[in-house]
């Protein structure tokens, strides 16, 4: 699709990947970007820069994928939709009923609204979680679904529904399976922070980062800015009824990750190792980047060192801004 002069709705547009997708869209000559978000995980702060652009607005009524009438109203006149709203992996583990409602019923509602409002193209955010542990590396898009957690199950269901809607209603969609996403605007406090943030928290306190296991578990860490680029590449492409890995294609063990963070933070602390938890969900997951490069024109632009430095710089800046705001209103703790 030629996105010039087109209107887009970003469902989950205030979240980590969603807000960066909004930023990336605005680099093109699009007509309008509507953000549809209930702000449970996303924040308006993530949109501060985007909202300065007159082409961007937050949908003024609702923002929940369970509100089907409001959702359809938001899609009125939209040329393309990015569906990024979902409960995250650990939230799905703790609250599977809510995960079913949001990730499965919510995705059905998005597809139904696209068909009802004749949206020309839908980009669906799936996940590499559909693969589970790697049987072979790098994992191509034909890798078997070896998933064993509920988050991955919801994404598998979403993919199956997308395909069925394409064949029954002609839904023009493409799906993206993100690898391990990190970057600016990522949560760094609360119960659901990712492994990189846990390591940075320890380093901040002068403690050694702790790895569960021997550190050999390896993943494909992809910068959130690259995920946003992949979303826009997918929207522009001619690919239909297909799924693509979004990653770098490069393998990084948790031990290597911790070592990189220690160097970038200028910290000489040794790495600590602890017994591996029985709850460890996946131990190895590195995806092939070839199909995405060949068919939707996406290639990762940010290497791990650069991406981690961007995250570290943003995290430090954001923490300072939050502290300054708290001080200004008399909240010193």
Predicted regions: what they are:
Residues 42, 66, 94, 102-105, ...:
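Residue-level signal for the nucleotide or nucleotide-sugar donor/cofactor binding architecture
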Residues 96, 188-189, 238:
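Active-site loop immediately N-terminal to the catalytic Tyr-X3-Lys motif
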Residues 137-146, 194, 273-274, 289-291:
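Short glycine/proline- and charge-enriched loop/turn segments
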Residues 63, 203-333:
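C-terminal substrate-binding subdomain of Rossmann-fold SDR/epimerase-dehydratase oxidoreductases
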Residues 157, 161, 165, 195, ...:
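Hydrophobic alpha-helix immediately C-terminal to the catalytic Tyr-X-X-X-Lys motif of short-chain
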Residues 1-179, 302, 310, 318-324, ...:
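N-terminal Rossmann-like NAD(P)+-binding domain of SDR-like oxidoreductases, especially those catalyzing
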Residues 109, 186-187, 217-219:
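Heptad-repeat alpha-helical coiled-coil signaling segments
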